[in-house]
A protein has these predicted regions:
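Hinge/beta->alpha junction and helix N-cap segments in small-molecule ligand-binding domains
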Residues: 71, 135-143, 164-175, 191-198, ...
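Short beta-strand elements of ligand-binding domains
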Residues: 92-95, 111-125, 226-232
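Short, well-structured alpha-helical segments in soluble
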Residues: 74-87, 194-204
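Short beta-strand elements at the ligand-binding edges of bilobed clamshell
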Residues: 122-148, 238-250
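An alpha-beta-alpha
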Residues: 142-185, 264-284
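Extracytoplasmic "Venus flytrap"
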Residues: 30-74, 170
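Structured C-terminal subdomain patch of bacterial secreted/periplasmic proteins
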Residues: 239-293
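Hydrophobic membrane-insertion alpha-helices, especially the h-region
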Residues: 8-21
């Protein structure tokens, strides 16, 4: 009889020990990511769930999405946040909801508010965002890696790389991209475009980079490997896209939360590089891309 009691006591102890982390995890206040419905649809609900799950494990606290209507005013966003959690650990806002972030911080001074500014211009006014953590995408680091990735995909063919880049990225992005090629003995030739209308058919094209411009190129189905800076659900992207650069709030959440917890009022966050088509890239190029981080 005593042995049975001891046995069941041990089993109960093991079960309790296993349950404690689960209980503690769900007892912790969540991180909230505010997003409008159009972005949620673009990114993909199942993809958001996966990213939130991984971020939750990384931070050891729940990460939840606050869905706001595309035309939501600042007050409506407050209601949407309150419906998800009345006591969040931190709330992440995209730049388009900057006014809602400021209002939330005024009403909830005990909760950290983070504004993810993405690739917004450096000279944008930020004085109005006092007491709000503001983080940007690390454009130079991203384009340095994109340049290295494009060179790896070229694989020494000495072909041409078409780089479609929105105007506001031209200075920092272009310089960083070129730096990635500068150390190569025989670098591929990058050709920069601000829009697809400037582009015409090019022979010896080994790679295409789409960074805020030139998305029309994907309609060509040319077979040339494409590096795409986008939030679009990969399941909706043509097979020519071999590498996606993702700076969405769900990807940036863990880093942003740690920076805010450390008291960093501003800072830069790198994007995630997601390989979609390993066979089209090739094993050697894939190894080089992974080495870039």
């Amino acid at each position: 009889m005593n042995r049975k009691i001891i046995f069941f006591a041990v089993i109960a102890g093991i079960a309790l020990a296993a349950a404690v982390p689960f209980i503690v995890f769900h007892a912790r206040s969540p991180v909230l990511v505010v997003a409008d419905n159009s972005i949620i649809q673009l990114y993909g609900s199942s993809r958001i769930s996966r990213e939130a799950f991984h971020s939750s494990l990384d931070l050891f606290r729940p990460v939840k999405t606050v869905a706001a209507a595309d035309d939501s005013g600042d007050d409506m966003v407050q209601f949407a946040i309150a419906e998800v959690s009345s006591r969040p650990y931190c709330v992440l806002f995209p730049l388009r909801f900057a006014g809602a972030a400021r209002l939330y911080r005024e009403k909830n001074p005990q909760v950290r508010a983070v504004l993810l500014e993405g690739r917004s211009p450096e000279n944008r006014e930020t004085d109005v965002f006092q007491d709000i953590f503001t983080y940007k995408t690390d454009i130079e680091a991203d384009f340095l890696r994109m340049g290295a990735a494009a060179a790896a995909i070229d694989g020494g063919k000495n072909g041409k790389i078409a780089v479609f880049m929105e105007t506001q990225l031209q200075t920092r992005g272009k310089d960083a991209f070129l730096r990635a090629l500068s150390d190569l003995e025989e670098p591929p030739a990058p050709l920069f475009y601000a829009s697809y209308s400037q582009f015409s058919g090019i022979s010896d094209l080994s790679c295409v980079v789409l960074a805020g411009a030139g998305a029309e190129y994907l309609e060509n189905f040319s077979g040339v490997p494409v590096v795409f800076l986008t939030w679009i659900d990969p399941s909706l992207i043509p097979n020519d896209v071999v590498l996606v650069v993702d700076d969405s709030p769900w990807v940036q959440a863990p880093r942003a939360i740690r920076m805010a917890a450390a008291g960093l009022e501003s800072g830069l966050i790198k994007s995630r590089f997601l390989v979609l088509n390993e066979k089209k890239i090739g094993a050697q190029a894939l190894r080089k891309i992974k080495k870039t981080g």
